[in-house]
């Protein structure tokens, strides 16, 4: 399989790390949607990252759909989400918050880097930033309390998504969110980023 996209995307990075943990062989092809548009288009004319090219040539888009397919391919040899109803709902809630955090951070980056200043709409930016801060607060609260140490044989999708989102936020929008205000997220991300699988797929 081939995974198309840059690791500076939280969506590409969460997929790459998860595929490795699921022991699914793949080739990462870091092709930029912005600097190599025509090259990316040759793999996916929709220009959406990540794109996964399956062994039979089918192309999958959307990181969550790709991971659903990947978990099916893994055939239960490694589960990134708990099977119990309550535990699974908790994990999905955390992942949802982490993905919302990523989405709002990406929106703010696009506003800053792609939209001309005279066309930016301040109320919209304030709304998105408010959503981002709400996601940070809710996600930090969702991880409060004791938890087992993170290891490559035990880390779940919710922790992967949380760490990837938190790291991306501070890489892409430095200084916007005070790290010290979210100590639970800061500690979890630091622990996850120390794992070799995270170091093998660095943000930059």
Predicted regions and their residues:
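GST-like fold's C-terminal all-alpha helical module
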Residues: 98-187
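C-terminal end-helix/capping segment
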Residues: 180-201
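Hydrophobic/aromatic-lined pockets within catalytic cores
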Residues: 71-75, 110, 170, 174, ...
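Short, flexible loop/turn segments with low-complexity composition
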Residues: 83, 154, 200-204
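GST-like domain detector, emphasizing the conserved glutathione-binding G-site
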Residues: 1-122
């Amino acid at each position: 399989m081939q995974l198309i996209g840059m690791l500076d995307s939280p969506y590409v990075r969460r997929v790459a790390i998860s595929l490795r943990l699921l022991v699914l062989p793949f080739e990462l092809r870091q092709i930029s949607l912005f600097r190599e548009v025509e090259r990316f288009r040759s793999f996916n004319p929709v220009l959406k990252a990540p794109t996964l090219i399956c062994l039979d040539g089918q192309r999958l888009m959307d990181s969550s759909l790709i991971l659903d397919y990947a978990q099916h391919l893994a055939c239960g040899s490694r589960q990134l989400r708990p099977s119990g109803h309550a535990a699974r709902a908790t994990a999905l809630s955390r992942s949802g918050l982490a993905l919302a955090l990523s989405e709002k951070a990406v929106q703010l980056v696009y506003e800053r880097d792609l939209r001309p200043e005279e066309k930016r709409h301040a109320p919209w930016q304030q709304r998105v930033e408010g959503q981002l801060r709400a996601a940070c607060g809710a996600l930090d609260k969702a991880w409060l309390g004791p938890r087992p140490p993170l290891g490559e044989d035990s880390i779940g999708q919710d922790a992967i998504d949380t760490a990837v989102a938190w790291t991306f936020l501070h890489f892409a929008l430095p200084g916007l969110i005070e790290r010290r205000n979210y100590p639970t997220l800061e500690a979890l991300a630091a622990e996850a980023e120390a794992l070799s699988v995270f170091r093998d797929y660095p943000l930059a």
